[in-house]
């Protein structure tokens, strides 16, 4: 028999990876008594694969998480050993920070942070069963004592038979559901190397009727820095100027985050930057060789990816090294980055070399690279197969379409990447709390956030492989820059109780300051004169040849506000304000064009489809369209239009049916775009 003394919470989060930590933190901050359960509290927020956070689109997600009061950005700022701004030579839409974190310190700081959050309890336990408020399609045991559970509550059963109850349940199980690890012909049950899989929970979800698919991911070998010839590598340093993921440290009277590590770095790494604005370690670039490729080709018959041992579908945009060599046979070499896994460890991550080849092959292929002739492997690479939900199981608020109050986030939804998981976890935690509080769900549109793009893609697209975020997936990416995530999202975070009033006030002051300076620039007329041109030339700005406004001068590609400010006696401002002024001035035409397109599309998004709308009864609809709409159950006309196989004629029929339904019922008021909307 299970324990008859269950603990009762508002929200329970199962799994304490990047999704689970953000979900639990958000729910607790919003006033819900929350429990975070994980198999191993020492591995909370563990970086199972690469020791990096951010990059194009992923860095955008981290900035958005921070703007919404999440943790990932600020924990990274305390634990990174290197940070860079990627795509610095390109436009602002694709520029994004990327950091190398000390992976063990990241987990330590995240755990210490969560331990200080009111309303949040942490417990170590493996969950084996879920009891639904109203069990559906269960093929399992009849011994569940549902009568002992509070009405309307979920229950989770641990491996020690403890029962915890909650009104909203969030599953963030990562790669643990019936996970198995694979290196060559060696196969063992694992959620990741060294940790047991959640086999019973995977079987229980299947018994409850949730359709599951098998996905695959992989990780490269880790090597010993003391056995690398760094003189044969290319060194890649971090940023020479201060750069963080978190917004407003100074404005909130918070000291810039000091590194959580101290003392000298591991002795093996050459050229550490110890006296700069922040101690940093370099990364190091090497390339594969013809011998490397030949070793891989010679052993393809031993590769689980090609022998049939691996059944799960892997991420297209993060292929294994053996897959790259087969698919891109014409490429003579591939770049591999050697990334230190921490400040004081000699363990190095070989980025770009994830593999499930036999361990002896891994040794041989790495030792074919000149810088790695004497390299020693500390851990072999492996693939991991796991269960994930089939497409169409989640709604736009991250909830289950089958069971109200049940939410999913992270790799269980078919995504890959820490940042994608954290973003989903944040939204799942927010909406779990809103569910408990009887409030409407919060949905972010595609024009509001990369988080909105991510979730909309999960809801409206067939996910056949682990999903990864790219800037190219965001059609409004000039509006969704990493630099303006605070202006876009922090006011909403304030409404939800995720950040305090002071932080919202700082954002609004910044917005007002940007608008004020743009007005000053537009109103300041300049005429060619010896005095003006001399001042411009002294600032490194080409002289005037005709009358123009100061804003028009700033639109020149090479001119920056902080360069123009002293030359024209313009108001001084903080660097982040100047950055916004630069972008708003230089890209005003493009921004206006995108904003008009957003307004056009927003009218479609605002036309909501009732959750119980009967697509099967819609006359004239093609069978393919009817089946697709029934499967995905879009929440808005905009979502319906983005579904594969839905054409304009289908949308026209749907609009007519909704108009007819609206005339027959009391109209539902559409929420203001800036407020949370129902999902």
Swiss-Prot record:
Source domain of life: Bacteria
The alphabetized list of GO BP terms reads:
tRNA methylation; tRNA wobble uridine modification
Which cofactors, if any, are listed as required? Answer: FAD
Q: What is its main location?
A: cytoplasm
Q: Where does FAD bind?
A: 15-20
Q: From the UniProt record, which GO molecular function terms apply?
A: flavin adenine dinucleotide binding
What is its biological role?
A: NAD-binding protein involved in the addition of a carboxymethylaminomethyl (cmnm) group at the wobble position (U34) of certain tRNAs, forming tRNA-cmnm(5)s(2)U34.
Assembly with partners or alone? Homodimer. Heterotetramer of two MnmE and two MnmG subunits.
Report the family membership. Answer: Belongs to the MnmG family.
- What this protein is called in its record is tRNA uridine 5-carboxymethylaminomethyl modification enzyme MnmG
**Species of origin:** Roseiflexus sp. (strain RS-1)
**Gene for this chain:** mnmG
């Amino acid at each position: 028999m299970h324990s008859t003394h269950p603990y009762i919470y508002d929200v329970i989060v199962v799994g304490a990876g990047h999704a689970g930590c953000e979900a639990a933190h958000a729910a607790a901050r919003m006033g819900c008594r929350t429990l975070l359960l994980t198999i191993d509290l020492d591995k909370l927020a563990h970086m199972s694969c690469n020791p990096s956070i951010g990059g194009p689109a992923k860095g955008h997600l981290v900035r958005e998480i921070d703007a919404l009061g999440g943790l990932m950005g600020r924990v990274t700022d305390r634990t990174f050993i290197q940070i860079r701004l990627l795509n610095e030579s390109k436009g602002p839409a694709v520029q994004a920070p990327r950091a190398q974190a000390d992976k063990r310190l990241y987990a330590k700081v995240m755990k210490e942070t969560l331990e200080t959050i009111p309303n949040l309890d942490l417990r170590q336990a493996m969950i084996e069963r879920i009891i639904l408020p109203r069990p559906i399609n269960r093929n399992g045991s009849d011994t569940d004592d549902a009568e002992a559970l509070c009405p309307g509550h979920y229950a989770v059963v641990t491996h020690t038979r403890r029962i915890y109850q909650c009104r909203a349940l969030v599953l963030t199980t990562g790669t643990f559901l019936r996970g198995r690890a694979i290196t060559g012909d060696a196969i063992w049950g694992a959620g990741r190397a060294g940790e047991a899989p959640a086999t019973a929970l995977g079987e229980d979800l299947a018994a409850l009727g949730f359709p599951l698919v098998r996905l695959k991911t992989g990780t490269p070998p880790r090597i010993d820095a003391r056995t690398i010839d760094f003189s044969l590598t290319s060194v890649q340093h971090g940023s020479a100027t201060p750069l963080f993921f978190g917004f407003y440290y100074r404005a909130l009277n918070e000291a810039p985050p000091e590194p959580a590590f101290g003392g000298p770095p591991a002795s093996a790494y050459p050229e550490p930057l110890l006296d700069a604005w922040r101690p940093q370690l370099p990364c190091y670039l090497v390339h594969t060789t013809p011998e490397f490729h030949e070793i891989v080709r010679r052993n393809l018959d031993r590769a689980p990816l090609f022998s049939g041992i691996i059944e799960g579908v892997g991420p297209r945009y993060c292929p294994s090294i053996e897959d790259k060599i087969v698919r891109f046979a014409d490429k003579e070499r591939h770049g591999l980055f050697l990334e230190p896994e921490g400040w004081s460890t000699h363990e190095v991550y070989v980025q770009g070399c994830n593999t499930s080849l036999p361990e002896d092959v891994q040794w041989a292929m790495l030792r074919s690279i000149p810088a790695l002739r004497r390299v020693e492997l500390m851990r072999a690479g492996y693939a991991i197969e796991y269960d994930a939900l089939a497409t169409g199981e989640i709604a736009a608020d991250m909830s289950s379409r089958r069971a109200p109050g049940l939410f999913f986030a992270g790799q269980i939804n078919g995504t890959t990447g820490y940042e994608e998981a954290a973003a989903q976890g944040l939204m799942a935690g927010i909406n779990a709390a809103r569910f408990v509080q009887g409030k409407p769900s919060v949905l972010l549109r595609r024009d509001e956030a990369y988080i909105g793009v991510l979730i909309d893609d999960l809801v409206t697209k067939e996910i056949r492989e682990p999903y990864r975020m790219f800037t190219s997936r965001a059609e409004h990416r000039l509006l969704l820059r990493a630099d303006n995530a605070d202006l876009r999202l922090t006011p909403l975070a304030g409404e939800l109780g995720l950040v305090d009033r002071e932080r919202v006030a700082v954002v609004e002051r910044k917005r007002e300051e940007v608008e004020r300076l743009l007005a000053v620039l537009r109103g300041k007329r300049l005429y060619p004169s010896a005095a003006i041109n001399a001042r411009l030339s002294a600032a490194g700005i080409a002289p005037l040849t005709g009358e123009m406004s100061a804003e028009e001068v700033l639109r020149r590609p090479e001119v920056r506000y902080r360069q123009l400010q002293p030359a024209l006696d313009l108001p001084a401002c903080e660097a982040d304000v100047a950055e916004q002024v630069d972008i708003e001035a230089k890209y005003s035409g493009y921004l206006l064009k995108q904003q008009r397109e957003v307004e056009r599309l927003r009218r479609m998004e605002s036309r909501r489809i009732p959750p119980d709308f009967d697509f099967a009864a819609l006359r004239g609809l093609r069978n393919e369209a009817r089946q697709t709409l029934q499967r995905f159950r879009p929440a808005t006309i905009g979502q319906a239009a983005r579904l594969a196989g839905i054409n304009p004629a289908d949308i026209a029929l749907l609009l007519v049916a909704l108009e007819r339904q609206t005339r027959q019922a009391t109209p539902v008021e559409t929420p203001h775009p800036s407020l949370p909307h129902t999902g």
